[in-house]
UniProtKB/Swiss-Prot annotation:
This is NAD(P)H-quinone oxidoreductase subunit I, chloroplastic. It comes from Dimeresia howellii. One of its GO terms (molecular function) is NADH dehydrogenase (ubiquinone) activity. Pfam families: Fer4. GO terms for cellular component: chloroplast thylakoid membrane. It is a peripheral membrane protein.
C-alpha cells in the first residue's frame, strides 16, 4: 500500500507541474495579444526597405569609363566588362556590361568602389524568374530605373520601424 501512495503523490506533483507549464505558456500568449501582427500579406502589402538596403544594381552606361574596378573588387569576379581601346583618343570605349544576379551575392563592393558612381543599389528585390538565364542582366536591363514600391498604388506599403515601448 505504501508504493501506491507514493505513486499517487508523484502523479499529483506531475499534474501540478504540467498545469504550471501550461499556465506559463498561456501567460506568454496573453502578453502577445495586444501587439501588432508581425506577418504581412506579401503580394498585396510590402515593407518599405531601408536606405541601406542592397537590392538590384542600377547601371548608368554613359558614366562608365571601363576601368574594371568593379571586377577587381568583386569577391566572385562577376561583372563582365567588354571594352575597346580607341587609339585616336587613347581611351577605352565601353561595349558591353553585364551582371548575372543568379550568382551575385549583393555585397555592394562594386557600388562602393566605382570611381564614377555609375553603379548604385536600388530597393528592388523581386528578381525571381523561371529561367536562371533571365537573371543575366546586360547594360540595357541594368539601366532600367527601378519602380518604387511607394509609388505603386496597387500595393499597401508598411513602414518597418521598431515599436517604441512606453
Amino acid at each position: 500500500m505504501f508504493p501506491m501512495v507514493t505513486e499517487f503523490i508523484n502523479y499529483g506533483q506531475q499534474t501540478v507541474r504540467a498545469t504550471r507549464y501550461i499556465g506559463q505558456g498561456f501567460m506568454i500568449t496573453l502578453s502577445h495579444v495586444n501587439r501588432l501582427p508581425v506577418t504581412i500579406q506579401y503580394p498585396y502589402e510590402k515593407l518599405i526597405t531601408s536606405e541601406r538596403f542592397r537590392g538590384r544594381i542600377h547601371f548608368e552606361f554613359d558614366k562608365c569609363i571601363a576601368c574594371e574596378v568593379c571586377v577587381r573588387v568583386c569577391p566572385i569576379d562577376l561583372p563582365v566588362v567588354d571594352w575597346k581601346l580607341e587609339t585616336d583618343i587613347r581611351k577605352k570605349r565601353l561595349l558591353n556590361y553585364s551582371i548575372d544576379f543568379g550568382i551575385c551575392i549583393f555585397c555592394g563592393n562594386c557600388v562602393e568602389y566605382c570611381p564614377t558612381n555609375c553603379l548604385s543599389m536600388t530597393e528592388e528585390y523581386e528578381l525571381s524568374t523561371y529561367d536562371r538565364h533571365e537573371l543575366n542582366y546586360n547594360q540595357i536591363a541594368l539601366g532600367r530605373l527601378p519602380m518604387s514600391i511607394i509609388d505603386d498604388y496597387t500595393i499597401r506599403t508598411i513602414l518597418n520601424l521598431p515599436e517604441i515601448k512606453t
